[in-house]
Amino acid sequence: MEAKAIARHIRVTPMKARRVVNLVRGKQANEALAILKFAPQAASEPVFKVVQSAISNARVLADRDGVAFDEGDLIISEAFVDEGPTMKRFQPRAQGRAFQIKKRTSHITVVVATPEKEEAR
């Protein structure tokens, strides 16, 4: 079973968000939440929320399908950050000049899944 959560237009640069996402990719969901809770990076808060949302989506899918749900079984099978739209702003500088400031945004995607049990032979 797979469940996905996407947060779009998050106001953090994709490079900084990728540093945080790389910490939790492949980990168990509960362990990932613990790592994100104490990570010092500012991008850890939106990633934490996306992981929580993916876990909740998995719970809803399990209830809908009538499957037993255990949060401890979930692992983060996919986690990636795509670049969102860039807001361009201008900073006034001396002698009538203006410097461009690029305020970057990110799209954060997290997929949680239950590992497939090996069939008995």
From Swiss-Prot:
Protein name from the UniProt record: Large ribosomal subunit protein uL22
Cellular-component GO terms for this entry: cytosolic large ribosomal subunit
A GO MF label: rRNA binding
Subunit structure: Part of the 50S ribosomal subunit.
Alphabetized Gene3D superfamilies for the sequence: Ribosomal protein L22/L17
Species name: Arthrobacter sp. (strain FB24)
Any one Gene Ontology BP term: translation
InterPro entries, per database record: Ribosomal_uL22, Ribosomal_uL22_bac/chlpt-type, Ribosomal_uL22_bac/org-type, Ribosomal_uL22_CS, Ribosomal_uL22_sf
Source organism, top-level taxon: Bacteria
Family: Belongs to the universal ribosomal protein uL22 family.
Keywords, in A-Z order: Ribonucleoprotein, Ribosomal protein, RNA-binding, rRNA-binding
Function in brief: This protein binds specifically to 23S rRNA; its binding is stimulated by other ribosomal proteins, e.g. L4, L17, and L20. It is important during the early stages of 50S assembly. It makes multiple contacts with different domains of the 23S rRNA in the assembled 50S subunit and ribosome.
